[in-house]
């Protein structure tokens, strides 16, 4: 029985059944040609984030914030910058204590190899920054990362008169990783001390939090194998570890992503995140290590913790309890875990709490609403409509966006897809169809927001007469631990099986031309694109793979070893998932696109695949963006997506 205050049967649900059946039967009504005629056409300058008109073609955004408990628009009153300001520049830490004061340099030996105050462990484990200000703002903790033992990847800067070497420290799977220590700087005494972590070789430290009284530091430690994690407490004054609050083991992997959150009315208790019951949930813990209760439970995941309402003694969260494609806001009673829905039960919601947690800015969208803002009283549950963004695409020939579900390759699990149809769609015609894929962990492509979360490039392609199909396979996020971990030690294999279930579904639709199937993806999606092109060479006619992983032994330590173990521990898995041996199977037209200075999926991947194709006598196409990283910045993104589009226009249409 659900503990949610509002009965689930009465909650608005995603309207999936009808459209799913329509998709299976191909029962899409033909577009009204007269309605489409005379409508304006999109360009990539309208749709792409690097386009000149992208902002005016996006739903209107309000910059709202709370000044204590008063709602303020940043266009009227800018949010003031808090002090002290602590930041990292040129790998050193700087401190500015007041407006107009001279910044003080706190560290002096920062370099490419020794970095202070920056995100470590390659931004894994939820690490987004490297400086952590105390509650009193009298001290801050910071990371120090030593990369001197890490192998360099030789990136080259070709922008000058003579090209120069600008290497990246890049720890590949199974190789030496960097070492991280944690410092504490006291602003008042201007002194630095260090946590006594011992030998930090092959240890990861994440989710740093100050205790409510600033006397202790809480952090999670993860071993190199990423099978064990502990929540440890360090005394700030001595730097010594004083206790371990919690331990967790998983035979596949653990992945702490969130710091603990102390109750503002009782600093002896805090909330911890864990997937130990199979889904991401919240647990109420005491500072002496006792688990008081599991606050949330069920076959759904908690997505965010926004803060607390002191008046109702509740924690405010978002979760996908109503439907896997939704994100809704709840107040959860600390005393008993009882959940109360705070929004309209539809779509995807994000919240910003007032200082005391009694009011909430609820920003949301649904498949039919571009963006909206409600103000919610978390105590009385009264919702007030604040703003509705007009449709920025009014007057344009807009495609049809549909959502449905199919079964995964296991025959049991529901997988959700989005389909995008041309504005002038005619069910009696046959359309070239492109499968857009990502497929990897920590991402999803389908959700119940505007146009079912469609990417703007899909709109552009549909306008040109293509059907687009996007499926979230097993291994993607927000569906629970088993759903994600099915890919462990053999990345890409179950994902391909699920994507081919999607292809089988497409082949049942009378308007999909099975002889003109294409596939496109970037990063993990680039890996999936080449995997599908070479494992199913008679299915896909054209593919465009951006920034593709080719062999996981060339990918970085933290991510690669979490999902694949090391090449020494899992030689069969690395051999099975490498695309080098698949180069000989390439039959269709494949374009590979990379940034020449990609620090995430280094160019070695694509270059080695090209070499394998040369040896095998197969003929992929290749395009490189000089000086660009894993994604193309600014207006170069418009050029990129025009190039991707043209490749399908040349060889699929």
Residue positions per predicted region:
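Beta-propeller folds
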Residues: 5-342, 346-350, 358-359, 367-369
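Serine-hydrolase catalytic core recognition
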Residues: 152, 214, 350-653
């Amino acid at each position: 029985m659900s503990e949610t205050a509002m009965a689930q049967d009465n909650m608005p649900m995603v309207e999936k059944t009808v459209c799913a059946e329509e998709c299976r039967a191909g029962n899409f009504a033909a577009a009204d040609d007269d309605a489409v005629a005379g409508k304006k056409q999109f360009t990539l300058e309208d749709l792409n984030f690097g386009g000149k008109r992208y902002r005016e073609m996006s739903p209107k955004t309000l910059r709202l914030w709370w000044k204590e408990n008063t709602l303020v628009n940043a266009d009227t009153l800018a949010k003031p910058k808090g002090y002290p300001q602590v930041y990292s520049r040129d790998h050193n830490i700087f401190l500015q204590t007041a407006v107009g004061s001279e910044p003080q340099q706190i560290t002096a030996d920062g370099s490419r190899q020794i970095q202070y105050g920056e995100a470590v462990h390659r931004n894994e484990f939820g690490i987004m920054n490297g400086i952590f200000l105390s509650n009193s703002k009298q001290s801050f903790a910071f990371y120090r990362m030593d990369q001197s033992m890490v192998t360099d990847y030789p990136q080259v800067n070709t922008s000058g008169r003579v090209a120069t070497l600008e290497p990246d420290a890049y720890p590949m799977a199974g190789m030496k990783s960097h070492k991280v220590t944690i410092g504490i700087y006291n602003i008042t005494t201007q002194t630095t001390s260090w946590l006594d972590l011992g030998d930090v070789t092959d240890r990861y430290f994440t989710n740093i939090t100050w205790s409510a009284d600033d006397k202790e530091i809480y952090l999670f430690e993860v071993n190199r194998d990423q099978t064990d994690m502990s929540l440890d407490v360090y005394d700030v004054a001595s730097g010594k570890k004083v206790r371990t609050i919690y331990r967790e083991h998983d035979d596949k992997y653990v992945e702490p992503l969130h710091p603990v959150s102390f109750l503002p009315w009782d600093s002896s208790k805090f909330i911890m995140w864990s997937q130990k019951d199979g889904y991401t949930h919240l647990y109420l813990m005491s500072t002496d290590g006792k688990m008081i209760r599991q606050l949330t439970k069920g076959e759904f995941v908690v997505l965010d913790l926004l803060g607390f309402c002191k008046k109702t003694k509740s924690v405010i969260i978002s979760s996908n309890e109503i439907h896997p494609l939704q994100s809704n806001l709840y107040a959860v009673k600390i005393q008993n875990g009882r959940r109360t829905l705070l929004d309209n039960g539809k779509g995807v919601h994000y919240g910003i709490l007032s200082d005391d947690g009694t009011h909430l800015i609820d920003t949301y969208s649904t498949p039919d609403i571009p963006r909206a803002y409600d103000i919610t009283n978390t105590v009385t549950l009264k919702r007030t409509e604040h703003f509705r963004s007009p449709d920025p695409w009014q007057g344009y020939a807009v495609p049809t966006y549909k959502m449905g579900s199919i079964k995964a390759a296991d025959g049991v699990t529901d997988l959700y897809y989005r389909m995008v149809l041309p504005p002038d769609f005619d069910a009696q015609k046959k359309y070239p169809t492109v499968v857009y894929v990502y497929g990897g962990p920590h991402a999803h492509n389908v959700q119940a927001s505007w146009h079912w979360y469609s990417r703007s490039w899909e709109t552009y392609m549909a306008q040109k007469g293509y059907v687009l199909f996007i499926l979230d396979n097993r291994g993607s996020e927000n569906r629970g631990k088993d759903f994600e971990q099915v890919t462990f030690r053999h990345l890409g294999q179950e994902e391909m099986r699920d994507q081919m279930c999607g292809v089988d579904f497409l082949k049942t639709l009378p308007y999909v031309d099975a002889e003109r199937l294409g596939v496109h993806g970037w990063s993990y999606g680039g890996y999936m694109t080449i995997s599908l092109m070479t494992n199913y060479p008679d299915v896909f006619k054209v593919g465009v793979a951006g920034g593709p992983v080719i062999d996981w032994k060339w990918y970085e330590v933290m991510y690669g070893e979490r999902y694949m173990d090391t090449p020494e521990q899992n030689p069969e898995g690395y051999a099975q998932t490498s695309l080098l041996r698949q180069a000989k199977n390439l039959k269709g037209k494949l374009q590979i696109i990379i940034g020449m200075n990609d620090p995430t999926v280094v160019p070695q991947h694509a270059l080695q695949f090209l070499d394998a194709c040369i040896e095998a006598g197969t003929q992929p196409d290749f395009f490189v963006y000089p000086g660009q990283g894993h994604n193309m910045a600014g207006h170069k993104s418009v050029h990129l997506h025009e190039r991707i589009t043209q490749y399908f226009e040349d060889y699929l249409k």
